Amino acid sequence: MTGREVNRRDALKAGGVALGGLGALAMTNASARAEPWSWSPQGSVAGQGAGADPRTVWDPEADAVIANVLERHNVNRINAELRTWVRNGQEVPSGLPAELRDFIEYARILPPWTDHNKLAGGFEFTKKQGTIISVLYAFASGMMSTVIPNEARAVYYSKGGQFFKDRIAKTAKLGYDIGTVNAYAPDGQMTVTCVKTRMIHAAVRHLLPQSPHWPKQYVPISQDDLMVTWHSLPTTIMANLTKWGVPASRHESQGYLHTWQVCGHLLGIRDEYLPASWREANVQSTQVLKPVLAPTREGIRLADDLLR
């Protein structure tokens, strides 16, 4: 990247959420899938949708706003304003550009299908099994990020590769926030964390294609990339818990999934791509996550750095 691009990229950290928060900094694979996209949106929380291959879909709502902010406004000042926005119920900082403020107000609204009873069940499960879930976040989901080829390469050749442990620590904030009893409540922080991360992803989509070190035909962080990372978290966690015989009531299991469904929505994943059940999550994961897992030189180096 040019010096100007690096400065702009570094400046828009959305108040402390590092580039690639949630680990979704990934390069869209332009090659055809081994099998055509076939997962039906009828299995989603929306129950319907266009059924387009998520590799061809990004986040136009966020992208247009963030691109204009990066090109036309003082990003350092915006970042300073965003650092003051921490809790879900806080007013959006008045010093932000109007278009960005309007986007944040829109993006932080919980989806209409949010079920607070299910969210409570998810917290009960996390509280009960918190230790083992935390271990899985680190050693299953965290290590898995190094064998997602596009993600590993993108992180390795970005600032995330230079400060990988710091990046993991900041990504872990999302894992912590989602497990709190007030995650999506006014005094919680999860909604803010998700919206800031969504804005960072939009910034990456705008800036990386301008870099001479980035293939111009690749637009990073498609809906597919977000879904791959999403499945490396709740789907992978629940699969391991089930395999190990960790008990979970129906209320707890559905609640844990629901906390991540709401998270996915707030991160900008379209409702038509969010699985409505664990069964659908496993089916979708088989198509989007499992086929891409493979070692790379960059991923091996990141894994080595992570384990030191």
Model-inferred region functions:
Residues T2-W230, P234-R308:
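Mature, function-bearing regions of proteins
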